[in-house]
Amino acid sequence: KEVISAFSSVNRSDFVPEDLILRSYTEKNLKLSSDRYLLRPNLIGEIINHVSPKSNESILVLPASTGYSSAIISNLAETVIAVEEDDNLISIAEKGMNKSGINNVVVIKKKINENCLDQGPFNAIIIEGAIDYIPDQFLNQLENHGRLFALIKKEDVTNAMLYIKNENSINSRFLFSCDAPK
């Protein structure tokens, strides 16, 4: 119920390029550039639901893309750090945050594979877009009992995985399979 309420308070059309506004609510991944996508709304909802952000938590989202999921999470968490390296996507994210009156999301221009130790550790990390594996640097940025959500691509299947840090170990749990772009 909280996730639905968080979704309802953010207009997806404020977080897409102008040429995609009419398609902003379609249940398709929206192609933003030759190699970047905005995940479809129902997949973003599944991700946020499984991460289950709390009002006192700090969440890292990378790559932040247009900031849409970060905006939704901002209604559930204390702070969202949104890492993005594409200037055009950062501009869309910042305009969307301003238009929506969101002030607890910090958009940081940085390479996606760089760490954010200065802002962490984080209660949860969300990696948007399919990847081949989880780099250790991301797991090292989690607080104890922190959660990391990732879409792991193996051949032609993408599995949604949740990793939980417990002291010095990481436990993983398969959540669901989906179609997600890299």
Features from the language model and the residues they span:
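Class I SAM-dependent transferase core
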Residues: 1-72, 76, 89-105, 168-182
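Conserved nucleotide-cofactor-binding alpha/beta core module
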Residues: 52-171
